[in-house]
Swiss-Prot record:
The organism of origin for this protein: Phocaeicola vulgatus (strain ATCC 8482 / DSM 1447 / JCM 5826 / CCUG 4940 / NBRC 14291 / NCTC 11154)
Protein name: NADH-quinone oxidoreductase subunit H
TM region positions: 30-50, 96-116, 129-149, 165-185, 201-221, 264-284, 297-317, 336-356
Assigned keywords, A-Z: Cell inner membrane, Cell membrane, Membrane, NAD, Quinone, Translocase, Transmembrane, Transmembrane helix, Ubiquinone
Top-rank EC class of the record's enzyme: translocase
GO MF terms, alphabetically ordered: NADH dehydrogenase activity; oxidoreductase activity, acting on NAD(P)H, quinone or similar compound as acceptor; quinone binding
Subcellular location: Cell inner membrane
Membrane topology note: Multi-pass membrane protein
PROSITE patterns associated with the record: COMPLEX1_ND1_2
Keyword Repeat annotated: no
Assembly mode: NDH-1 is composed of 14 different subunits. Subunits NuoA, H, J, K, L, M, N constitute the membrane sector of the complex.
Disulfide bonds: none
Biological role stated in the UniProt entry: NDH-1 shuttles electrons from NADH, via FMN and iron-sulfur (Fe-S) centers, to quinones in the respiratory chain. The immediate electron acceptor for the enzyme in this species is believed to be ubiquinone. Couples the redox reaction to proton translocation (for every two electrons transferred, four hydrogen ions are translocated across the cytoplasmic membrane), and thus conserves the redox energy in a proton gradient. This subunit may bind ubiquinone.
Enzyme Commission no: 7.1.1.-
């Protein structure tokens, strides 16, 4: 498996050979920031196109086909259309909070996106408390959503924001419990270290029953946390028009839209990192030839392949199941997922203490 840190160390030594180290670090930070923004934009474009095609497939349609080959340039046309739209601020809105809210949501999404270990040595933010930072960064987005609903001075926006806040805060608990189950198994909160521990097998397969239960809980709770169907009640069109971003137009609406899709990718990428081995290839015990071939595939291809498979799975769920009511959503969380998650966590503790894991 290629270690990308060799490249970063070579670039750092090259820059420090003809400039002060402080200036070299500053240039590296700028380059990394630009790369993160470009990767964020590319992921958003792919996710939007994938959503439209997957939706069309489940509805027996073709989806975007007009602009570009097989509709591949349709997303760029939509972005251009959104860029030239006027940004309208409604009367009696709290203009400062109204304009600030989309940037808080997108900032939280970018911070969480920066934590993803795409390849060995290719982590931007790799702390020894990476899981803690990831959960903290992703939870900031609910502040922007609540501000968007409150500052819009619109009852539909406010109801959508309150629904979203209640839903996100509730399901954050189940997400944390499912991740904590694997943290107990690995005895580390560093994302890259969790991936390294899966070199001899993904936790979904070698973590016993608690890992499988935690994976299922994580998919359900993660889907609800990013307000995806069937948990998309905060923006239920039949009740609340567009929910908390009803009064937003132009690129302000575009920021909410992009953040929603990238947050879906982040949920899938974290599932890949924690349960599906991250950048680790698929190894089958006893098949050394097959395993050797799998090792030739670059780690980032494994990471993105697994992540987009989980994304497709979540999109499948969205376009298959009907929307739940708010009482059903909260009942599912507090009466079922949380108790099951706590019992599952206790079961994992017993397995680790008595060394019953593989």
């Amino acid at each position: 498996m290629f270690d990308f840190s060799i490249v970063t160390q070579w670039v750092h030594s090259l820059l420090t050979s003809f400039m002060p180290e402080e200036l070299a670090v500053l240039i590296e930070c700028i380059v990394i920031g630009v790369c993160i923004m470009l990767a964020y934009a590319v992921i958003a474009i792919i996710m939007i196109f994938m959503e439209r095609k997957v939706c069309a497939a489940f509805q027996c349609r073709l989806g975007p086909m007009r602009v570009g080959p097989q509709g591949t340039i349709q997303v760029f046309a939509d972005v251009f259309k959104m860029l030239i739209k006027e940004i309208i601020t409604i009367r009696h809105a709290d203009k400062f909070l109204y304009n600030l809210a989309p940037y808080i949501v997108i900032l939280a999404s970018i911070m969480a996106f920066s934590c993803l270990p795409i390849n060995k040595g290719m982590e931007v933010l790799d702390f020894n408390v990476g899981i803690f930072f990831l959960l903290a960064a992703s939870s900031i987005g609910v502040v922007g959503i609540l501000l968007a609903g409150w500052s819009s001075n619109n009852k539909y926006s406010l109801i959508g924001a309150m629904r979203s806040g209640a839903q996100m805060i509730s399901y954050e608990l189940s997400v944390g419990l499912s991740i904590l189950t694997i943290v107990i198994l690995t005895d580390t909160m560093q994302l890259s270290e969790i991936v390294e521990r899966q070199a001899d097998g993904w936790f979904l397969f070698k973590g016993h029953i608690p890992a499988l239960i935690a994976f299922i809980i994580y998919l359900i709770a993660g889907n609800a946390e990013v307000n995806r169907g069937p948990f998309d009640l905060p923006e239920a069109e039949s009740e609340l028009t567009a929910g908390y971003h009803t009064e937003y137009s132009g690129m302000h609406f575009g920021l909410f839209y992009v953040a929603e899709f990238v947050n879906l990718f982040i949920i899938a990428a974290v599932a890949t990192t924690i349960f599906l081995g991250g950048w680790m290839p698929l190894h089958i015990p006893g098949l050394d030839g097959f395993n050797a071939i799998m090792d030739y595939i670059p780690g980032f291809i494994w990471f993105f392949g697994k992540s987009f498979f989980v994304v497709w799975l979540l999109m499948w769920i969205k376009w298959t199941f009907p929307r739940l009511r708010i009482d059903q959503i909260l009942t599912l969380e507090w009466k079922y997922l949380v108790p099951i998650g706590l019992c599952n966590l206790l079961l994992m503790v017993i397995i680790v203490v008595f060394k019953l894991h593989f």
